[in-house]
Amino acid sequence: MQRSIKIETHFLRPQYKIEEKIKERGDEQQRTTNVHADVTNWHLQLDDTYKSITGHIHENYPQHTIKELWGCTYRKGDFTQAHNHYGFDRAFVWFVDTSSTCSPLIFPDPEHPWMPDIHVITPQNGLLVVFGGCELHYVPPHVNNYERVVMSGNMRLNT
């Protein structure tokens, strides 16, 4: 029997030009992470530019603290290797500027790899997806010319 994953979704309209701010930062990680795309530094939660997402997270998950927040810009051929966010209670992806033809966020079933993926999240501007930090996920190679801009983050339970 295929296992289930608890995924919570919210909608938060991206504020004006937030995608430009992410793109302006460029690839601060120099493609050294699981994300083979342009990735900003890990600490955008400290920048008021991104207070719409941090405020939304704090309002909806008051028992958690955002420990890391970063932006990603995927171009044709970019992808993210399968990984999880071990050591964090929750992780999230916020689709800032995408189209439904952009590569999805996929949650495979590592216990039953012959089974269909557990969840395939089609990008939609403003969609915020929150999931357990231990859940395996990936993004297949981006196949079109529309830049896929997202913000991702990690949260820990307050102690």
Predicted feature descriptions by range:
Residues 1-63, 69-72, 79-80:
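Non-heme Fe(II)/2-oxoglutarate
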Residues 65-141, 146-150, 158:
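Catalytic core of non-heme Fe(II) oxygenases with the double-stranded beta-helix
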